[in-house]
Amino acid sequence: MLGRALVRSFVQPTAAITTQLAGVHHHQEATDMKRFTGVTRSNKAKANRNTHVNEKLFRRMRGRKTLLIELPEDSAREKEAEMSPGEMRTELLKRGINPYKEAQPRVWNEAQVTFQSIYGIADPYVPPENPGSFTDVNNKFDEVKQRIQHKFYNWRMGTNRIRKKQGFEKFDIKTFCAKAEDIYVQAHRALEQRDKTAMYKYITEYAFAKMWPDVENGSVRFELISVLEPSRVVAVRCFDNPPKSGNDIAQITVRMHTRQKLAVYDRFGGLLLGSEDEEKDVVEYVVFENHIAVVDGEWRLHGKIYPKWIDAKQGMVGTQMLSAEQVEKQHAEAKALPLRTTEKLEEAKKEKEQQEI
C-alpha cells in the first residue's frame, strides 16, 4: 500500500504553472545586438517599445532638472574666424590642445570630373608598320589575326556606331584627316600663346592636364614645316561613358608624318627640349576625341600613342651651351682635389715617421 501511494505521488500529473522571468539585460548587450539596438524588448511584458535600452545608465541624467553645457561666446567665435593658421595653433596650444596631434589639418584632393570626355585612350593598339616574316608561323598568324580583329572593330565599334548618331550620318574617315591636321596645328598655337579658351576648344580636359604644365612655368615654340606623308586613320573606337548610358564618345587615332620645329623652355629661358632652328621628321599617332552624344560635339586633340617599335623620345637637355667668351674664361689647368679623411691620416702618419727618422 505504501509503495502504491509513493508511485501515485510521483507519477500523477499536476497542472502546469507558467512563471514570468524578469532579467536584467544590460550585461548581455555585447552578445545580443538586437536587444542593444532596441529591436527586441528587454522586458517582454512591457508594451512600451520606446523605453531606452539601457534604462539604468540614463536614469540619473533624466532625474536632473538642468544640464550645464559649455558654449563658446560669440566674441570668441568672431576672433577665431579672424585668426590666421599660426594664431589659431597658438590659441589651441594655450587651451592644451595640440592641433597636429589630436586634429590633423584637412588635405584637399580635388579632381575635375566630366562626362564629355574620358580620361584615357580606349584602344591603344596600333598595327605594326613592318609586317613580320613568314618564317615565324606562330607570330605571323597572331599578327594577321590581330589585324583582322582590329579592322572589324574599326567598323563595328567605330564608323558604324558613329553614323547612327544624329548629325554624324555622313561621317567619312577620308575627309577627317585634313580636319585632324588643322586641329593639331591650332592646339599647339593655343598652347604657345597660353590661350586657355582656345585650348579647351581644340584639346580635351585629359590633354589639357598634360600640356598646360609645359607653359605654366615656361614657354613652348612650335612650327609645322610640312606634311611628309598623307595622314591616315589607324583606329576608330566608339564607347559610352558610363557603360550602358547612351553617352557615346568617339576616338580616332591618326598617323601623322610631319616635319616640324619644337622647343620647350623653362621659366628662366633655358632650353629644356628640342630647338627652334633644327627641323625634325616626326611620326606620331595622335588621338582625337568627340562627344558624339550631343549634336554640337566637336573633334578635339586628346592624346598620343607610343608603340613599341617607335623611336624613343629625345630626353630633356640638362646643360646649356657656353658662348665663345665664356669658354675663354674657363681655366683648363688641373687642380688637386682636397684629400679624403683616410688619405689625410695616412699622409700625417708618413710625415710623423719621417720626423722620427
Curated annotation (Swiss-Prot):
Amino acid composition bias (Basic and acidic residues), ranges on this chain: 341-357
SMART domains found in the cross-reference section: Tim44 (SM00978)
UniProt KW keywords: Mitochondrion, Ribonucleoprotein, Ribosomal protein, Transit peptide
InterPro entries per UniProt: mtLSU_mL45, NTF2-like_dom_sf, Tim44-like_dom
GO (cellular component) term, any one: ribonucleoprotein complex
Disulfide bonds: none
Stated family: Belongs to the mitochondrion-specific ribosomal protein mL45 family.
Phosphoprotein found in the keyword field: no
Protein's cellular compartments: Mitochondrion
PANTHER family xrefs: 39S RIBOSOMAL PROTEIN L45, MITOCHONDRIAL, LARGE RIBOSOMAL SUBUNIT PROTEIN ML45
UniProt name for this protein: Large ribosomal subunit protein mL45
Highest taxon of source: Eukaryota
Chain segments annotated as transmembrane: none
UniProt region (Disordered), positions on chain: 333-357
Family matches, as Gene3D superfamilies: 3.10.450.240
Pfam families from the UniProt entry: Tim44
Primary subcellular site in the record, as a coarse category: mitochondrion
Record bears the keyword Iron: no
